[in-house]
Amino acid sequence: MAKKTISRLSVLAVLIVFLAACSKTSEYTNVIPADASVVASINLKSLASKAGLDDKENEAAKQKVLEALKSGMNAATFQQLEKVMNNPSESGIDVEAPVYVFTSPSFPYSTAVAKIKSEDDLHASLEIMVKEQICQPINEAAGYSFTTMNGGLVAFNNSAVMLISVKGTSQIEKAKEGITNLLKQTADNSIAKSG
């Protein structure tokens, strides 16, 4: 009797973990519109592994890059960069989850979407980029934060970060209007429903 109960509880526990994992994954994919004409998935961890970035042979090259960068930035910036290079998840982006790239008629900008692991870490990473004048200061909008950089708009909330390819101020303003809707979008209105 006890074995049967343990067996059933084990199956239930596995099912709960599976459902929880699925719901977390789909939350950030809800920003992908249902009418997306092209969607590509990129597995960053697999890509880094295949590129040999985890290999011991590349450790020396990584250290040389860090040393070269160290001379051109202040200590706090370098410390954050070194932390992210040694552990990419410190960037605030969940590198274990797929990154999706999409285009759609309703949001006609090439967009990459990644899962947020830590909104605070992402803010810290972007603040470093602001200090190094790589991007503009972070601003708040209707339910999300954003910054701009050369040819790109980065928008994020607590679950998703979007990198949108835009050209000029008029496209940035139009994209910002659409971002509000995408970040509030439910699974019913997203590609998650058709997946």
Where are these regions (language model features)?
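Structural boundary/hinge residues at secondary-structure and domain interfaces
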Residues: 22-148, 169-170, 174-195
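Short, surface-exposed loop and linker segments with low hydrophobicity and enrichment for Pro/Ser/Thr
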Residues: 10, 105-106, 150-159
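Charged, amphipathic alpha-helical scaffolding segments
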Residues: 153-174, 178
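Sec-dependent bacterial lipoprotein signal peptides
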Residues: 1-20
